[in-house]
């Protein structure tokens, strides 16, 4: 807190004294873009229950940084990065964000995965007026001028997944999630959506601690409820335990389908395609997405990290984030937060998932929706997709059922 107060006081004194344009006027953090380099922060869980997922996001960001540096950097400067471990704890994310912004004075930060970690740092980024580039799909119901939401809003992942299942004839839904803000808000949305579908019903809803490894009682409840499909919003290592214990009961996708929102290629590798094959996921990108840019991305990722490594939606969004920041800085001709923010409005880049564009009103991204099926080779293949990118609607204001149900943020 003292460091933050010193920062705020310095800005106040700078303004009152009307000092020169040098010094306190820049919200990049003074030393972040000095000399021939510009320094950014990377803030992800490299340890703890979320390391299984966040490591690939960090790796994609480093790959993008190295590619950009090799091509000449940003505004003639090479990118350097300071890396911090959020350790799968929201309070640690907050502490590390304070360090990156207050002590290291980085130009921007690429970071977080869980909504709990994002919410833990949100006020800190707003206090310092810096930008967090958040790479993961989330529950929506939020917009901040200090966060660029590179992952899907609920209308670009959750809502179309339920629509797809309903169209396929699934009627009985069991909701299972980790016990924190994303799954609970997602399931609030899903409950409202299912209530509006004729003949559909939620037959059960359960939550597990982030580090929970025992799922036998929950699986018994699922068996008793006999759903057509399990809607899975578990995160981290909980997914490994749940699906392996489901397999121990000899329950496969032929018996009971799952639709997951946080299982990507990395998690399939860890859990096993023999266990997950046939199940469904909803994202905006897969390693198998057929674009020229994606072929280049996958080739570069494997060349750097090994042929056995896989790309994923969050990793691709993190990779895109670094390139979108570069494009915004170059459009603005500046690393200053306000200049970069203004440059973001309507900015598009050619990404591995296809062309993506920033909505300047809410700093979310237009994205193509892709429903995927996990196959025996461990990859995910598109089985349904929108014809074009879907504009973000983080507050679901365009859905009558959401408005009528009074869907609202959960803290």
Model-identified regions with their sequence ranges:
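Immediate post-signal peptide segment of exported/extracytoplasmic ligand-binding proteins
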Residues: 27-43, 70-78, 165-171
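Segments of small-molecule ligand-sensing domains
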Residues: 304-312, 326-389
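Beta-alpha junction/loop-to-helix N-cap segments that form part of ligand/metal-binding clefts
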Residues: 28-32, 52-59, 71-141, 150, ...
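Extracellular/periplasmic Venus flytrap/periplasmic-binding protein
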Residues: 139-140, 145-248, 288-294
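Extracellular/periplasmic periplasmic-binding protein-like sensory domains
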Residues: 246-319, 329-333, 385-410
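Extracytoplasmic "Venus flytrap"
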Residues: 41-60, 84-91, 113-114, 176-184, ...
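Short, low-complexity disordered leader/linker segments with a strong preference
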Residues: 1-39, 70, 395, 402-411
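Periplasmic-binding protein-like
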Residues: 100, 104-112, 133-135, 174-177, ...
């Amino acid at each position: 807190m003292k460091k933050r107060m010193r920062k705020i006081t310095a800005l106040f004194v700078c303004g009152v004294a009307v000092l020169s344009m040098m010094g306190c006027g820049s919200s990049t953090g003074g030393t972040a873009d000095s000399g021939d380099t510009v320094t950014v922060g990377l803030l992800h869980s490299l340890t703890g229950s979320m390391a299984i997922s966040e490591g690939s996001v960090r790796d994609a960001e480093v790959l993008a940084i190295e590619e950009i540096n090799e091509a000449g950097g940003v505004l003639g400067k090479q990118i350097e990065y300071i890396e911090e471990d959020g350790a799968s704890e929201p309070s640690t994310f907050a502490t590390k964000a304070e360090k990156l912004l207050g002590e290291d004075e980085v130009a921007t930060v690429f970071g977080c995965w869980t909504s709990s970690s994002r919410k833990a740092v949100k006020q800190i980024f707003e206090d310092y007026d810096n930008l967090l580039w958040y790479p993961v799909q989330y529950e929506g119901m939020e917009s901040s001028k200090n966060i660029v939401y590179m992952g899907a809003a609920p209308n670009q992942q959750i809502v179309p997944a339920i629509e797809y299942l309903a169209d396929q004839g699934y009627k009985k839904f069991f909701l299972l999630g980790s016990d924190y803000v994303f799954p609970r808000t997602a399931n609030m949305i899903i409950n409202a959506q299912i209530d509006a579908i004729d003949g559909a019903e939620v037959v059960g809803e359960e939550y597990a601690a982030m580090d929970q490894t025992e799922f036998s009682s929950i699986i018994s409840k699922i068996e008793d409820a006999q759903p057509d499909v399990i809607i899975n919003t578990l995160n981290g290592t909980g997914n490994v335990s749940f699906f392996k214990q489901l397999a121990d009961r000899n329950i496969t996708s032929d018996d009971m389908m799952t639709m997951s929102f946080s299982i990507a290629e990395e998690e399939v590798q860890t859990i096993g395609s023999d266990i997950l094959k046939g199940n469904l996921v909803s994202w905006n990108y897969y390693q198998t997405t057929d674009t020229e840019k994606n072929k280049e991305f996958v080739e570069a990722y494997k060349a750097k990290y090994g042929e056995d490594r896989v790309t994923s939606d969050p990793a691709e969004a993190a990779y895109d984030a670094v390139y979108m920041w570069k494009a915004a800085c170059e459009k603005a001709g500046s690393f200053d937060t306000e200049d970069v923010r203004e440059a973001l409005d309507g900015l598009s880049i050619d990404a591995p998932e296809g062309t993506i564009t920033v909505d300047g009103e809410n700093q979310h991204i237009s994205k193509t929706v892709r429903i995927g099926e996990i196959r025996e080779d461990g990859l995910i293949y598109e089985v349904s997709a929108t014809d074009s990118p879907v504009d973000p609607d983080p507050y679901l204001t365009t859905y009558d059922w959401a408005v009528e149900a009074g869907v609202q943020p959960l803290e």
